[in-house]
């Protein structure tokens, strides 16, 4: 089993008298910036001129500068931007201002692991990745708790990179819950695999296939939506709270029996073989190259797929049914 590290295993000393630039002020950016500030760290937010997040960050009491100015003023730079824009921003606005001994941080290893960003040899390169959305990272911190984090070291120029990563994780509240050491490679490859095979790609394909099967068999689309999409949250909440065991303890015997006897007929040996092929594409860099080329071309494929998926019948049915859900309007 992996070892978890807690508050007593880390200290904030590496952050003493240091300025941290948080590049981006989205879901993770606002949580990191505010938690760091509340932990006594000097924080600057780096944004592009005219960013709608600029006044919001200022209203939150933070100093805001352009990305280049923030990078120039900081000792530590955390890049919390979409994967596809990080390379250009790093090359044009961050790299020219990095000084020996600085710390370059990421919350996902994609651009480092796949060579899109090649940092200078005289800076530490580390990762701190909360395993939860930004609003949860912030809310739990304010409640005196935290969200578990992964941390990793890619480049240790100072000899203190590991301690620095743990200090940052502590400052955003991670060590209150526990932090797990990993590598950029492991985090990147497992994250992409989980997204593609289970959480996003696998789940949405399963939901749509179930919906389509019922509708094609003559059942009302509304019932198909309830059974194949709406109730997913009910099951997932049980799994998150107590694992598969709690979910199976909470459902009916009929549902549990169907789980054991029919589930394996959906995830077959052929499905598992395809999972392995997808993992191999991630490990080889094939997916990363494909994604980079897609973005360089202006995202024509992604745009077309978004448009096509938005027109799926399940979306129209869902919009109509969700209008009935009063709890979603609160």
UniProtKB/Swiss-Prot annotation:
Among Pfam families, the record links this protein to:
KARI_C, KARI_N
Annotated binding of NADP(+), by residue: 25-28, 51, 53, 83-86, 134
The main enzyme category here is: oxidoreductase
List required co-factors: Mg(2+)
Q: Which reaction does it catalyse?
A: (2R)-2,3-dihydroxy-3-methylbutanoate + NADP(+) = (2S)-2-acetolactate + NADPH + H(+); (2R,3R)-2,3-dihydroxy-3-methylpentanoate + NADP(+) = (S)-2-ethyl-2-hydroxy-3-oxobutanoate + NADPH + H(+)
TM ranges are: none
Q: Name one GO biological process term.
A: isoleucine biosynthetic process
KARI N-terminal Rossmann domain span? 2-182
Domain KARI C-terminal knotted, which positions? 183-328
SUPFAM superfamilies, from UniProt?
Answer: 6-phosphogluconate dehydrogenase C-terminal domain-like, NAD(P)-binding Rossmann-fold domains
Query: What is the free-text note on the cofactor?
Result: Binds 2 magnesium ions per subunit.
Enzyme Commission numbers on file = 1.1.1.86
- InterPro entries given in the database record: 6-PGluconate_DH-like_C_sf, KARI, KARI_C, KARI_N, KARI_prok, NAD(P)-bd_dom_sf
Binding residue positions for substrate: 252
Gene Ontology terms, MF aspect? ketol-acid reductoisomerase activity; magnesium ion binding; NADP binding
Binding-site residues, Mg(2+) 1: 191, 195
What family does the entry list? Belongs to the ketol-acid reductoisomerase family.
* Protein name as catalogued: Ketol-acid reductoisomerase (NADP(+))
Which organism is this entry from? Answer: Synechococcus sp. (strain JA-2-3B'a(2-13)) (Cyanobacteria bacterium Yellowstone B-Prime)
């Amino acid at each position: 089993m992996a070892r978890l590290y807690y508050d007593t295993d880390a200290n904030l000393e590496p952050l003493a008298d240091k300025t941290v630039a948080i590049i981006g002020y989205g879901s993770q950016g606002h949580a990191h910036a505010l938690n760091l500030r509340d932990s006594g760290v000097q924080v600057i937010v780096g944004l592009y001129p005219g960013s709608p997040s600029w006044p919001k960050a200022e209203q939150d009491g933070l100093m805001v500068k352009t990305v280049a100015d923030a990078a120039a003023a900081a000792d530590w730079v955390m890049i919390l931007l979409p994967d596809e824009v990080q390379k250009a921003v790093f090359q044009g606005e961050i790299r020219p201002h990095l000084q020996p001994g600085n710390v370059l941080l990421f919350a996902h290893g994609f651009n480092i692991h796949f060579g899109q960003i090649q940092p200078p040899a005289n800076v530490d390169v580390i990762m701190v990745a909360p395993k939860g959305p930004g609003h949860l990272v912030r809310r739990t911190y304010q409640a005196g708790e935290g969200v578990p984090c992964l941390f990793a070291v890619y480049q240790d120029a100072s000899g203190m990179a590991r301690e620095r990563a743990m200090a940052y994780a502590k400052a955003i509240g991670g060590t209150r819950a526990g932090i797990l050491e990993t590598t950029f490679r492991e985090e990147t490859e497992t994250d992409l695999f989980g997204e593609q095979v289970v959480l996003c790609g696998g789940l949405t394909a399963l939901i749509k296939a179930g919906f389509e099967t019922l509708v094609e068999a003559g059942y009302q689309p509304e019932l198909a939506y309830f059974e194949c999409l709406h109730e997913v949250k009910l099951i997932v909440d049980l799994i998150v709270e107590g694992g598969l065991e709690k979910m199976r303890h909470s459902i009916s015997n009929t549902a549990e029996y169907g789980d054991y006897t029919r589930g394996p007929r959906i995830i077959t040996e052929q499905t598992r073989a395809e999972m392995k092929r997808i993992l191999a594409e991630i490990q080889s860099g094939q997916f990363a190259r494909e994604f980079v080329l897609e973005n360089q071309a202006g995202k024509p494929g992604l745009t077309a797929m978004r448009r096509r998926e938005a027109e799926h019948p399940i979306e129209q049915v869902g919009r109509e049914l969700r209008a009935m859900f009063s709890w979603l309007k609160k």
